[in-house]
């Protein structure tokens, strides 16, 4: 199962040209690749023109003399559904921030936006209202948010029975072996 992400290019104040990426959507993978290899507007535009991706890598163009698809990928070359798999209807689409923030039926976990200022920002999908984070800054400072921004804000929220919730949740877990967890109800 993949960690799905949106990769978007800001084109208006609340309009983003967006593609889907099926695999490796975590900030330390897709985020790092975007920050390091797609740090110029032209390069981001070329990436977005590929449309939806199977997975993102540092290079855009495969060697045309060699096979390149999800079964036989060329090293470090991005796999695009249309170009490399022959799929249709994979073009970039225009989305608003509200649309990017909705994980929808396909379970988008992270959203990456290349801003007008030429930097990559990200947020766990569904949590845009908690703010955006700078990909490069978080990678450089080892402050990447892998899960959710929720943990930064949960202490400021009024949670009734917060401790009881944790105890109730933990009581459903039975540890049968050191490496296995089994849920019981």
List where the protein language model places each region.
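Single conserved hydrophobic/aromatic residue that forms the stacking wall/gate
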Residues: 173-185
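Short, extreme N-terminal segment that most often corresponds to the first beta-strand
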Residues: 1-30
């Amino acid at each position: 199962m993949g960690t799905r992400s949106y990769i978007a290019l800001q084109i208006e104040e609340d309009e983003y040209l967006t593609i889907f990426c099926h695999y490796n959507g975590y900030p330390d993978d897709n985020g790092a690749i975007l920050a390091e290899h797609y740090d110029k507007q032209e390069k981001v535009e070329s990436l977005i023109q590929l449309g939806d991706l199977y997975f993102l890598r540092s290079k855009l163009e495969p060697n045309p003399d060699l096979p390149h698809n999800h079964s036989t990928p060329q090293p470090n070359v991005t796999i695009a559904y249309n170009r490399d798999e022959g799929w249709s209807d994979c073009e970039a689409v225009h989305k608003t921030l509200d649309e990017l923030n909705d994980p929808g039926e396909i379970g988008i976990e992270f959203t990456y936006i290349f801003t007008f200022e030429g930097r990559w920002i990200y947020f766990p999908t569904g949590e845009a209202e908690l703010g955006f984070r700078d990909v490069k800054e978080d990678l450089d400072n080892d402050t990447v948010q892998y899960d959710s921004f929720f943990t930064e804000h949960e202490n400021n929220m009024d949670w009734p029975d917060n401790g009881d919730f944790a105890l109730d949740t933990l009581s459903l877990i039975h540890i049968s072996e050191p490496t296995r967890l089994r849920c019981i109800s």
